[in-house]
Amino acid sequence: MVLKELPTLTARLTELRVDARLRSFTAAEAPRFTRALEPAHVLSPEALAAYAVAYHYIWTLLLPYWWMESHDTFFLFAQSPDGWFMPLLPLGPAPLEQSVGEAFELMHQWNGPSPVSRIENVMEPQKQELERGGFRCRQKGGDYLYKAEALAALAGDHYKSQRALCNRVEREHLVTIEPYRASDHSGCLTLCDRWAIQKRGGTLDSMGQLLLEDAKVAHDRVFVEYDRVGLSGTVARRHGEIVAYTFGYWLTPQTYCVLLEVADRSISGLAQFLFRETCRAASTRGALYINAMDDADLPGLRAAKLAYRPTAVLDNWVVMGR
């Protein structure tokens, strides 16, 4: 999640277009973004969750995103308080070294000598190619990838605790799972507020607090525009009240990404139950893998994701220039 690197996450920036070719990134660009993925050859089981439009679009009320095309290649830029950067590689048929070089030329024009110029969410094959071309890279936290079948079943001793929590929800609470509908908007917002209060009552570090402050804005955008950017949602109800929700998207026909998940923390095991049901539904629809994204450098989230025994933590690199 790129926002964790910003000094003030909730800054509302004045949109300043520094190049006439730049256009504001909206949901209308979703088809264009998707078309650009194929010739870029970046989608595979090891692809990062960032190579989907929803991953970026939900944050555009907090951080202006801009796009442009050059040599039939799609460039996506984010305008942070510190300057301009790219949240993912240029997408298109142009040679990677050429398009990345062009991207850094533009960012250096806009940012001057500032080290903020960078390209995030670069995968291992592209990183190796760019290093051969003289580009410098540094590693950042990667996405957690799981076998969908394993998370749907939660079989064996390795998943004993998660399975017990799911069983407790089934035994003690009458929870129903339903697809998200537009009429669920208000109930999900109410839950989001309650969840944020519960989280603040726990042990959050300063970064966790900052991420939480921006969550409501991003989640509210999802509730309203989910279908415009390829998201599907699920809600859990108890006695008619929404007590959990989750949204995700298909990164590839074999990989389902869990974009966000919120569960009432007063119901023990509810988060684990919802995650299992999400994985079951994805597996039924053909998913071989579940991408649960990164851990945002939060120790608690890292421990929770490792407890599900990922098959891989996908390499994720930042290109810093030559």
Model-derived regions, located:
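Active-site/acyl-donor-binding loops of N-acyltransferases
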Residues: 2-17, 136-155, 289-322
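Short, polar loop motifs at secondary-structure junctions
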Residues: 120-127, 162-165, 296-297
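Short catalytic-loop micro-motif centered on adjacent basic/acidic residues
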Residues: 116-118, 178, 288-292
